[in-house]
Regions:
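Extracytoplasmic
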Residues: 16-58, 66-71, 122
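Short hydrophobic/small-residue motifs within alpha-helical transmembrane segments
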Residues: 60-62, 151-152
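Cytoplasmic helix-loop-helix junction between adjacent transmembrane helices
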Residues: 112-148
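Residue-level signature of the transmembrane alpha-helical cores
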Residues: 24, 84-90, 94, 110, ...
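Helix-loop-helix hairpin linking two adjacent transmembrane segments in secondary transporters
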Residues: 142-181
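Small-residue-rich segments within alpha-helical transmembrane domains of MFS-like 12-TM solute carriers
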Residues: 29, 33, 99, 115-123, ...
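Short hydrophobic/alpha-helical segments at membrane-entry points of transmembrane helices
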Residues: 105-112
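Conserved MFS/SLC helix-loop-helix module at the cytosolic interface between two early adjacent transmembrane helices
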Residues: 66-104
Length: 181
């Protein structure tokens, strides 16, 4: 049986379809609650303590961890398009708000929600391209490729946030991620 992605429109070339999902997974993974590459700029601009900013990251991680058991339930309940659009819109809205919200409980809630959308979008993209990566569902091939996507985006987001901070404002990274989504 040949690998196919029926959820993608016919005008998209078949060779490009799985790569679109890998790029979308990278985009979801680049999104974050706060960016450590711009940590000092965030602390200086918002007058928050380092622990407050790190708590944003912990809330993002908690959102991903608590939503993980729900991923397959969501995948089997909703369509691919619905899940990707919802996750993308959530990442877009939360990234636009996170840069400007100063009340910490609301900021932590937004970071938690952004973590849920981040893991949902990444899971949807990577589970759709899994059979393309390894037609026999060999997890010894799939998980290293998944880790390459995750680690690449982690390094990329720190570099990009430091660069955007150098260009002018640490919020540029949030605007960039919102624009990508």
């Amino acid at each position: 049986m040949k690998f196919a992605m029926p959820m993608v429109k016919d005008f998209v070339p078949k060779a490009v379809r799985p790569w679109l999902y890998v790029v979308m997974a990278l985009c979801f993974q680049v999104s974050a609650a706060r960016y450590l590459g711009a940590l000092n700029e965030i602390i200086g601009a918002t007058s928050q303590m380092r622990e407050d900013v790190l708590m944003c990251l912990y809330c993002n991680l908690a959102g991903m961890a608590l939503w993980f058991p729900m991923l397959f339930r969501m995948k089997f309940r909703f369509t691919n398009k619905t899940l990707l659009v919802a996750a993308s819109l959530t990442v877009l809205v939360t990234n636009l708000l996170i840069g400007y919200v100063t009340w910490l409980p609301l900021l932590w809630l937004l970071c938690f929600i952004e973590g849920i959308a981040k893991i949902q979008g990444t899971f949807e993209c990577m589970s759709n391209s899994q059979l393309w990566m390894t037609p026999k569902r060999d997890m010894t091939i799939f998980f290293p490729l998944l880790h390459i996507v995750i680690l690449t985006s982690m390094n990329l987001q720190d570099f990009m946030s430091a660069y955007f901070g150098m260009l002018g404002d640490w919020r540029l990274m949030h605007w960039f991620v919102a624009g990508v989504h």
